Amino acid sequence: MRKQFTAIIASAIALVTLVARAQVGAIDPNRPHNDHDYEHEHEKKQKYTCLMHPEVITDHPGNCPKCGMTLMPIKESKRSTPNAQRPTSNKSHLSHPSHSSRASVVASAKEDPSHEMHQHGMEMHSSVDLADPMTREGSGTSWLPDSSPMYGRMFMFDGDMLMLHGAIFPRYTNVSTRRGDDRIDAPNWIMAMYSHALGDSTRIGARLMMSLDPLTETGRGYPLLFQSGESWHDQPLHDRQHPHDLLDELSLSLSQKFDHDLSAYIYFGYPGEPALGPPTFMHRPSAMDDPDAPLGHHWQDSTHVTFGVATAGFAWKNVKVEGSIFTGREPDEDRYDFDRPRFDSYSGRLSWNPTRNLALQVSYGYIKSPEALEPDLKRHRTTASVIYNLPLGHYSNWSNTFVWGQNHDTGEGKTQSFLIESNYQRGRDTVYVRWERVEKSGHELVLNPPDESRIFPVSGYTLGYVRDLTHGNGLDIGLGTQFTINNRPDTLDRYYGDDLGYAFQFFLRIRPSLHSHGSRQHGEHVAGIEK
């Protein structure tokens, strides 16, 4: 217990330290600039500036010498009142920019450069496909709604972009029934996204995702009633969520934009994520405050850590078609090594974002031999999902996800999974819910031989609440709790007992604050407005 507790503390310190150290030598696009620039900019009638670096001012159009962005003209805005005052660097102005109080585009860019990028039709780009806005980028090559919030820290290095984000949940969790358990642990992950422009229409990207789960969770993982998948000491795990590998993504991508509406990309990951399923649960805004994995993880998004992935796709406007070849085998029990790439499976996905607030996808995949204990197993997976995100104002957001996943395994037939998640944030307070129903075989639940071939519908109902203790100052630390009720058929009582299945936990949620380029910081993202 002492080693585990030490690992939890070390994980939290590592997350905080990495975010802090990355600021050294970087240009933070959210950093306020000197007020004397404001006076200088208004002495000239026509100048050009960089929205990320307002101190760059020229008398001709072109590209920013620091980051390579297209320079924008400084335009004088009309004041709505004669008493409008010059903008300041006060945080209240940063949080609630007023159009009537802005004296110029540059002055407001100093308050919130990302706001002006939207005002002029400019956006920060995805590291996978330069035609996509950064807010659309989910796990792997998946799409989120364009209005999704981004929690992370962005830095610019001479035109290159680096984004850091992640989360850690130091907690106490307690699960009932004979198969339950209680423990102190800390699910966690941290990710870096980097992109470099090779010209106006070509970009390369790289991503690194890591987790200290092997230290904080150990090989058995954490207790989670009715969860299944993977193994420990050559025995199948049941009623526990397996830990993730130390290295969960190491990927490179190359994207090309052919015109305003058409682009294409290639993506290679070792490990990486194929074009199969919705964005992985920890990357969905609707699940970002829930420390637990969904019970349908191995029906919906379990391929997010795959040792050997190659994906190609093209996007036209808000529609994307992509296909992958990848390794079907899930990670082995050694969470610190690189597994052998096989490229023996394939998948395809169709994604469509009809509005800024909606992301839809359908996908199919053939997965060969996903489990080491069942080398002859062949799995056909089909998924569909709808993600709806609604910004409600400054630091207020409502995100929802529906996922359906179906596995068709050799010798077992088809089993279904359904999930609904919702996350409502208002200021420092967040309330979230998750409902799911999954059909699992007795073999999956590791029951006795007479029940192995039977299918059992199991479900979970979760309600959680988080209150931020620190908020919006670079690192959000929230104190949270959640309660889950699990339902099962009476025929499972011989394994779980007669008691009600439930779980509760108390946790800290530690993550970077909302990035100012996130959708909730922009004036056009008011309640009910879509673009």
Question: What is each model feature region?
Answer:
Residues Q23, R102-K110:
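Short Gly/Ser/Thr- and charged-rich N-terminal loops/segments
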Residues G152-R153, I190-H196, L250-Q256, A310-W316, ...:
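Residues on the lipid-exposed face of transmembrane beta-strands in outer-membrane beta-barrel proteins
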Residues D160, D182-I190, H244-L250, H304-A310, ...:
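Residues that define the transmembrane beta-barrel architecture of outer-membrane proteins
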Residues L162, D200-I204, H260-A264, N318-E322, ...:
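Repeated loop/turn-to-beta-strand initiation elements of outer-membrane beta-barrel proteins
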Residues L164-G166, I204-L208, I266-F268, A312, ...:
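Membrane-embedded beta-strand positions of outer-membrane beta-barrel proteins
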Residues E217-S351:
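Surface-exposed coil loops of outer-membrane beta-barrel proteins
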Residues D498-K531:
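Outer-membrane beta-barrel "beta-signal"
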